[in-house]
């Protein structure tokens, strides 16, 4: 994970991405938050996640919808674009509705708008 840090050189980050692509349990790349790795790795984590196929991403849709709560967060636009490519049927709709209800409960207007934008594109 340390090699995905945006403070590393481009070469080190490229090596980090190469190694990360080999990780099978990619859920570790869903907005990690610990002492050393948090927003500083999210851009590269989003790249890894966005490369996955729809079927692999399906169980993690709520986490992806949560990532676009604030499009200023590192990696959020990458995830937004990946969600736009996702086939909007079945679990996508269920996950979207679940997270939209959460955004409504929080009265988070920005998040609700982001969710509407990603669904209607």
Residue ranges and their predicted role:
Residues 10-22, 42-55, 66-70, 74-86, ...:
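Structural detector for internal amphipathic alpha-helices that build alpha-solenoid repeat scaffolds
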Residues 1-2, 23-34, 54-67, 88-100:
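Amphipathic alpha-helical scaffolding segments comprising HEAT/armadillo-like alpha-solenoid repeats
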Residues 1-41:
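Terminal domain-start segments
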């Amino acid at each position: 994970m340390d090699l995905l840090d945006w403070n590393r050189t481009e070469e080190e980050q490229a090596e980090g991405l190469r190694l990360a692509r080999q990780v099978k349990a990619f859920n570790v790349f869903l907005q990690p938050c610990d002492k050393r790795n948090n927003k500083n790795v999210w851009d590269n984590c989003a790249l890894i996640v966005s490369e996955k196929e729809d079927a692999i991403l399906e169980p993690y849709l709520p986490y992806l919808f949560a990532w676009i709560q604030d499009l200023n967060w590192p990696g959020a636009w990458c995830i937004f674009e990946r969600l736009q490519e996702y086939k909007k049927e079945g679990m996508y709709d269920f996950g979207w509705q679940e997270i939209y209800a959460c955004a409504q409960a929080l009265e988070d207007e920005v998040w609700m708008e982001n969710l509407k934008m990603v669904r209607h594109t």
